[in-house]
Amino acid sequence: MALSDADVQKQIKHMMAFIEQEANEKAEEIDAKAEEEFNIEKGRLVQQQRLKIMEYYEKKEKQVELQKKIQSSNMLNQARLKVLKVREDHVRNVLDEARKRLAEVPKDIKLYSDLLVTLIVQALFQLVEPTVTLRVRQADKALVESLLGRAQQDYKAKIKKDVVLKIDNENFLPPDTCGGIELIAAKGRIKISNTLESRLELIAQQLLPEIRNALFGRNPNRKFTD
């Protein structure tokens, strides 16, 4: 049975409505999927940027902490250096005061004479040379000349060897030297300084840890002494 024009039109409208509905549903499905993908990508980008920002500020925070530690360490080191300088200056002042007192030693002729003989003989033990020249302060020349025989006797009594001692009459120790002598042997190739200053310096180096301990107390963090 043939369809009437009205039926055909009705079928066509029905098909068009179905096609339109299917197209709308497909479009909505595409839109939903696109929106979902957009939201996922947006979330990924947001998270990625958030991580970058967090990493940036974590790095900055670490840099700030490191800078603080460096500054703190530098300040601590500077403070320690200042303390050390003050202590060393104080030790140096103690030694300077000792040097001033050394200048008083030659005023006691008996004490100074015994000291000169001891200094000469000690140096002769180190040299063990047959002929030795003594360099002295010009002010001490006569005194040292009077002590040469005594020094030679003391040396021979202890080492069983003779030694010829003579004073350098052309070159003297500086007048501001506190006292003592220099001994020269082997045509000037060997020289021993036994001035009062050099002896004080030697003793100071040996006793420096004890001097520090006496002035400031023992350092509990220090395992070894100088």
Swiss-Prot record:
Protein name in UniProt: V-type proton ATPase subunit E
Family to which the UniProt record says this protein belongs: Belongs to the V-ATPase E subunit family.
Job of this protein: Subunit of the V1 complex of vacuolar(H+)-ATPase (V-ATPase), a multisubunit enzyme composed of a peripheral complex (V1) that hydrolyzes ATP and a membrane integral complex (V0) that translocates protons. V-ATPase is responsible for acidifying and maintaining the pH of intracellular compartments and in some cell types, is targeted to the plasma membrane, where it is responsible for acidifying the extracellular environment.
Record's GO cellular component terms: proton-transporting two-sector ATPase complex, catalytic domain
Source taxon at top rank: Eukaryota
InterPro entries for the chain: ATPase_E_C, ATPase_V1_Esu
Keywords: Hydrogen ion transport, Ion transport, Transport
Paired cysteines (S-S): none
Ion transport found in the keyword field: yes
One family name in Pfam for this protein: vATP-synt_E
Subunit structure: V-ATPase is a heteromultimeric enzyme made up of two complexes: the ATP-hydrolytic V1 complex and the proton translocation V0 complex. The V1 complex consists of three catalytic AB heterodimers that form a heterohexamer, three peripheral stalks each consisting of EG heterodimers, one central rotor including subunits D and F, and the regulatory subunits C and H. The proton translocation complex V0 consists of the proton transport subunit a, a ring of proteolipid subunits c9c'', rotary subunit d, subunits e and f, and the accessory subunits VhaAC45 and ATP6AP2.
Gene Ontology MF term list: proton-transporting ATPase activity, rotational mechanism
Gene name of this polypeptide: VHA26
Entries under PANTHER family matching the protein: ATPASE H+-TRANSPORTING V1 SUBUNIT E1A-RELATED
